[in-house]
A protein has these predicted regions:
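Conserved active-site tyrosine of GNAT-family acetyltransferases
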Residues: 163, 168, 190
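Conserved acetyl-CoA-binding loop-helix of GNAT-fold acetyltransferases
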Residues: 118, 124-138, 160-165
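Conserved catalytic-core motifs of GNAT/GCN5-like acyltransferases
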Residues: 149-152, 169-187
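A short, well-structured alpha-helix characteristic of acyl/acetyltransferase catalytic modules
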Residues: 2-67, 71, 196-204
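Glycine-rich acetyl-CoA-binding "A-motif" of GNAT/NAT acetyltransferases
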Residues: 94-97, 158, 184
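Conserved GNAT acetyl-CoA-binding A-motif
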Residues: 141-151
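Acetyl-CoA-dependent GNAT
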Residues: 63-121, 193-194
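Short glycine/proline-centered loop/turn elements that form peptide/ligand docking sites
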Residues: 128, 132, 155-159, 176-181
Length: 204
């Protein structure tokens, strides 16, 4: 087992530590909570049958996944000690997205962040901004991280705007590092440090 921060990992279940609560955010009926094994069927059926092509484009993944692939990935993610896998739940109970802290290095106190909303109808409503800020706060308040980082493609300016609003800063560009159809595009690197997050919280 990897080095686990004993301050924030409060409850040991099987081979993974959990916080003493699964829910990290609630707003207007929307909830962000840790994923559970019981969610896997709904996760697949509500979001991968079929997967929105724009989601595939903006995340760099393929457009079609088998049920076996999704189930295997989902359940494996729950077992990883360096990942917090949160689901974004709509007021009607449907899973509409995910917000993930992964690749956690407890010694360096750094991690990667990614987020995705699966349904086009839910985009542009501020849900992604809210979920990003809630997950960011969890990373620094509960996990006591020093650095949270991400990458975003240059053809996804809406996401970059969300990250900038949440306090992430551009720190580099991998030029022509990916393909958008038949064209090259940039991969933009961004991060936020704990001191920057503290200043941001004091200003709001």
């Amino acid at each position: 087992m990897k080095n686990i921060n004993p301050i924030v990992k409060l409850e040991f279940v099987g081979e993974k530590y959990y916080m003493n609560t699964d829910v990290i955010g609630e707003k207007d009926g929307f909830v962000i909570r840790l994923a559970k094994a019981d969610d896997v069927v709904n996760y697949y059926e509500q979001n991968y049958c079929p997967l929105d092509k724009e989601v595939a484009r903006l995340t760099g993944c393929k457009e079609e996944f088998s049920k076996e692939e999704v189930v295997s990935f989902f359940l494996k993610s729950l077992e990883e000690n360096d990942r917090y896998f949160f689901l974004i739940i709509a007021p009607d109970g449907d899973i509409i997205g995910e917000s993930v802290i992964n690749e956690i290095d407890w010694d360096l106190r750094r991690a990667n962040f990614r987020i995705g909303l699966y349904r086009q109808a839910e985009r542009g409503k501020g849900i992604g901004t809210w979920a990003t800020e809630i997950t960011r706060d969890f990373a620094f308040e509960k996990l006591k991280l020093h650095r949270l980082e991400l990458d975003v493609y240059s053809f996804n300016p809406r996401a970059e705007t969300v990250y900038l609003k949440a306090g992430f800063k551009r720190e580099g560009v991998l030029r022509d590092a990916i393909m958008d159809g038949a064209k090259y595009a940039d991969d933009i690197l961004m991060s936020i440090l704990e001191d920057e997050w503290r200043i941001l919280k004091m200003q709001r």
